[in-house]
A protein has these predicted regions:
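C-terminal partner/receptor-binding element of secreted or periplasmic proteins
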Residues: 119-167
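Predominantly extracellular/secreted and cell-surface proteins with exposed
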Residues: 26-102
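Solvent-exposed coil/turn segments that connect beta secondary-structure elements
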Residues: 96-102, 116-118, 126-128
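A short, surface-exposed beta-strand/turn
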Residues: 106-124
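Short, solvent-exposed mixed-charge patches
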Residues: 170-172
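N-terminal segment immediately downstream of the Sec signal-peptide cleavage site
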Residues: 1-56, 139-155
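Generic recognition of long tandem-repeat/solenoid scaffolds
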Residues: 14-17, 93-95, 123
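Intrinsically disordered, low-complexity acidic/polar segments
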Residues: 68, 104-106, 122, 132
């Protein structure tokens, strides 16, 4: 079943933004994450996938301390789906991924991806395999409505014209 009103292309790929605050070693907000993800798993069953149509989940995001220091990048790739379950308006997708860390890529990292009300996505990565790099909370993201994505792309294609228009309107 297609996601109602959400961005989805002809191959069933859905994408969205990572926008999350992660706790530091003291359990307090210490890091900001910002980036993107895309997947084909949303609103599908495990039987939807096979060797010629594998489950996909990829993400890339920047991570910086709240003061702007220690900026670095992470990628999540090589998703392997092992289980799908649903409870209420939340669907959970479990599997393993490869994630880049300072020391290099770490393979076979357990992940749980949750989709809530088709608007919010969370990524929970195994803290042991990642040396607690992402703190003690899930990484949060959003699933934008297709209309919002189209509007954003339209504004981006207009380039400086959009910025000039907003600047002129704010000066009135």
């Amino acid at each position: 079943e297609a996601i109602p009103n959400n961005w989805q292309d002809q191959k069933g790929l859905v994408f969205g933004a990572i926008s999350s605050i992660q706790n530091n070693n003291q359990g307090k907000p210490g890091w900001v994450l910002s980036g993107h993800w895309f997947t084909n798993i949303i609103n599908k069953t495990k039987d939807s996938f096979n060797q010629t149509n594998p489950a996909k989940f990829d993400s890339w995001f920047y991570m910086s301390m709240l003061d702007g220091s220690a900026m670095h990048k992470h990628t999540i790739s090589n998703f392997s789906l092992s289980d799908i379950s649903s409870q209420g308006n939340t669907t959970s997708y479990k599997g393993t991924v490869t994630i880049t860390l300072k020391e290099g890529p770490v393979k076979e990292v357990p992940i749980e991806i949750k989709v809530m009300n088709n608007h919010v996505i969370t990524l929970s990565l195994d803290a042991t395999k990642t040396n607690k790099h992402f703190g003690d909370t899930p990484i949060y993201g959003i699933i934008p409505a297709r209309a919002d994505v189209m509007k954003m792309m339209s504004h981006m294609s207009m380039g400086n014209k959009t910025m000039d228009m907003h600047m002129n309107m704010s000066q009135k």
